[in-house]
Amino acid sequence: MPNRVNFKIPKSLWTARDSARLASDTLASIKLRTSKGIDANGQPFKPYSTTPLYVAKRGARLKPKGGQPSRTGRSIYYQGGYKQYKHDSRRRGGGGHSAEVDLVLSGHMINNLVVKEATAAGFVIGLTEHAQYGYAVNQTREFLGLSPKDVKILTKAVEIELRGKI
C-alpha cells in the first residue's frame, strides 16, 4: 500500500506545490534511510537469507555473477543463498557504500518509488505499476513509511515553511 501523508493546515497557507516539494524531500529521505539499511521503524533490516538457492540466468532482473554454474548451465548455484547472490551480483562502483541489506540489487524497485500524488491536503508516496512486487518486499522489510526520525523532520519542515509564510 502507498503511504499517505495528510495535513490539517488552512488552504490559504499551504498549497499543492508546498506538498509536492515536501513529498520530494520525504521521498529522498526514505531512499537515503533505506540505503543505510534502516526500516520505517528506525531498526536495521532483517538480514538476507543464507539458504542455498539457484538463480536462472534467463529472466533474472540482474545477471547472476559469481556462484557455481548448475549442471545444465541455465542457472547459478549460490551456497550462501540470496545474501551471496546479492553480494556477488550487485554493481560495485567507486561510489558511496550502502548497507548490506539496502533493498537494491538492480535498482528497479527503489527507482520506481515515486510521489504519486500531491495536493494541498497532503501527498502519497508509492510504487509505480512496474514495481508492485515492492509491496510484498515491504511485508518482510518495512521500507515504505516514515520512521520516528522522519516524522520529526517532516513536522519541522512544515513548521519552518509555515513560519516563513506568516
Residue ranges and their predicted role:
Residues 1-166:
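Short, Lys/Arg-rich flexible segments
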